[in-house]
Amino acid sequence: MAYRNKKKKRKKSQFRRFLYVALLAINILVGLPLLFSFLAQYIPPSTSKYVAFSGIAFPYLLVANCIICFLWIFVRYQYLIISLTLILLNTNTIDKHYQFKGVEKPQKCAQCIKVMSYNVRLFDLYNPTPSEFGKGKEKIFNYLKIEKPDIVCFQEYFLDKGNKLNFFTTDSILSTLELQNDERYYYQYFPNNLRNEYFYGLAIFTKYRIVNNGVVELEKGSNNIAIYADIKYRSDTIRIYSIHLTSIHLDKIDYETGKYFSQNLNDPNLSKKTKNIYLKLDVAFKKRELQVKMLKNHIDSCRFPIILCGDFNDTPASYAYNQLAKKFKDTFRESGQGEGITYHGDAFPQYRIDYILYDKRYKSYGHTVTNSIKV
């Protein structure tokens, strides 16, 4: 009887030891990348691509480490300090991804300015369904009519200059926002056009008079640019930026691969199939690093308070976002709620990649993200 009890105890001890070793190995596997995701905001992608990729995975690494912490309580509670330390180290990064306060705009706010940033994806111009042509644009205009922003910055803006498509944008927006048809109240710049008829670029519309404007070339020969408009607000001048950093340039095959990836995680050839996406991500990280450097130089030379709106094509844990956000407050962090997701991909994870940053002298109220318009 005593021998049998000893045997049971030995088996139990061996199982606990196996559990401890397995959990420790998993802890290291998910703990190190979480440390790298913390470092992603400081280390340029050109220095370490692995750190940059860990930044993308931050939300998933955070959840994994929380689960590990919970499991250590039942195995060896002293070891939960590993993941707990890493989670606490990332407190600031967590704050960039999740918000619970949701500060609402006061009922009376005479000095408040309503600002909107919107990547309109060419107003859904290339919708493959003929019957849907122009409907995406109308949804956007209806939304603008309801929200009535004082300042709106557009990325992936489209202008049908000759009105050959009967696809009016600039005139319609001026009418919708009840702005004067005067270039002192809007600024648009198009780095790319087709046959000098169809123009693609960025735009800023404002109810406040523009006293100066210009373009910031972020990369030679690239369509990714920033534009700015200095507006007169009361006795102050405020600089508004609308920016669009480089995207990953995923194509149809990449999206199909992404869908396959999410459904076939056990495929031994998965790394080969996703290699193209990996390479595109790596290139995009490094390009955004250089683009942010150019933009920061321009921002540093400005003597006015700044509001910076745009599609960064990068996450809150990224080097690009954190380099730009250093000098500013983030509307989501100051007055947002939830995750603030702005990219809803079918094949890829959802992220916050669009931002409004602003001068630290100002205050933010009622940051919201609309999910009602699909274009």
Give the location of each predicted region.
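Metal-dependent phosphoester-hydrolase catalytic domains
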Residues: 22-34, 39-70, 81, 215-217, ...
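Residue-level signal for alpha-helix termini/capping positions
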Residues: 74-75, 145, 234, 300
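Structured beta-strand-rich core segments of catalytic domains in phosphoester-bond hydrolases
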Residues: 83, 87-112, 121, 138, ...
